[in-house]
Amino acid sequence: MPLFRKIHIKNFHMYAVILLVFIFQYINSDYGNKVNDFPYLQNSTIETSDIGNAMSRNAVNGYDVRSENVSKWLMRFRLYSIEADEMLNIMALGRIKPSKLEFDPHYYAYGGAYLYPLGAWYAMLKKIGVIKVGDLKWMIDHSDEMENIYHYGRVFVLFSFVLSALLMFYTLKSFSSPKFSFLATTIYLIMPINIMFSIIMKPYVYSLLWVNLSLFILSIAWSKKKLTTGLSLAMGVSLGMAVGSVIINGLFAVIVWLIIVYFSIHSKINISKVFIIPIVAILVFFITNPYIFINYDAYVEELSRQSDWFFIGRQPKFVMDFVSNSVIPGFGIAFTALMLYALLSSIFTSSHVINKIVSYSIVAIIVFISLISASISEWHINARYVLYFIPIIFILFSFSLNRNKIRVLKVVLFVTLIQSAPLFIAYIDEDSYEHSTRIKSAEWINNQNMLV
């Protein structure tokens, strides 16, 4: 620790840490593919007529699902990844055919502000020969190419994540010292929930790119003490992309809107510039998610199917379940303690009214998310719905009266690193013939069928 005090944090220190995390996660991102190496799975014949109609029904995640059969399960080994729902990205993109001007993904849980950029990423990789794609039969017969597609889809999310970290670093520098910003961003990079979801093809961590861009723009307006038309337009686009990727991020947009309205009331900001933001945000949301309106029937069918999973909780226990089962495992026990301190400090000791408003908003969101996710309250990954808490809490903490902020962040970093360490090992074990229960199961299936 004494050595760290002598280091004058420069930007390149942050760049080095971000690059190190990127390299490590890039190596880890190609995981969960060795099941297809077994002869039975490699050589089995799959009847495409028996594998269902997900590529033709109106809602990919609808009710029109055919019964299970051997061909369908073998197809899943060839075309699905180890991560639940990653294949829905591929199904949705497979329904989009630009040459025929067909852009409806027929899957809407992952927003268009995420799916369309992911599709553009794949189109670029295909053009330069990094990935190969074909029709359904070709993909089934070339499962190694499917593995490549999943790998580079995860890399797309990883790129977004490290860029979001860079934005967070520069945002925090507007409110605090370079050392504070460096420590906070490093914690952000190694947090368990971010380690997990930065190499999974889902929109939650990807949306942090737009969340942190919104906060970065806000920090520019705060430091300049004015909101220009350009900043308003940029803020509207970034919020629209954040919500257009993950609709629950609308709660984050409300927090940002409250901050902007508060400052507009207490400054000489032109009110028209303030209202540009929601207008542009809504416009961007509609542009990136047009088919929830154009193909409303499919959207309703998907929502109906998803509603079968959920019920609204009404008991305080669900709040405790959310914190104990998702927030602490996801954010880390040390950051959770820091979050509690930052919220209480802002509510009871801060002289900044806006800090109190933001803190009360976060508490309200915790209760709201806890109750609407009551049916899955035992899951450990629900913190993905509130990832925007992380940068907000660090900003609140930077305003606290605590004189030992750097020391506190060092402790949080150390404890978070210890808590995240098993995750790094888990990715190694996932492809280990000695430790992976999934691979051992595949080996057993292979051996049993080879005896027949």
Segments from the language model and where they lie:
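Membrane-embedded, lumen/periplasm-facing catalytic core of multi-pass transferases
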Residues: T416-V452
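Short helix- or helix-capping micro-motifs
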Residues: V21, A184-L189, F216, L239, ...
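Signature aromatic-anchored transmembrane alpha helix within multi-pass, membrane-resident enzymes
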Residues: M1, H8-L19, V237, V254-L258, ...
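Transmembrane-helix motifs of polytopic, lipid-linked glycan transferases
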Residues: S143-E147, H151-F175, L213-I217, A342-S345
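Transmembrane-helix signature of polytopic, membrane-embedded enzymes
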Residues: Y15, V130-I140, M168-I190, T229, ...
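Hydrophobic/aromatic-rich transmembrane helices and adjacent perimembrane loops
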Residues: F197-S198, Y204-L208, A242, L251, ...
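Membrane-interface transmembrane helices that cradle and orient dolichyl/undecaprenyl
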Residues: K173-S174, P178-K179, S214-S232, A242, ...
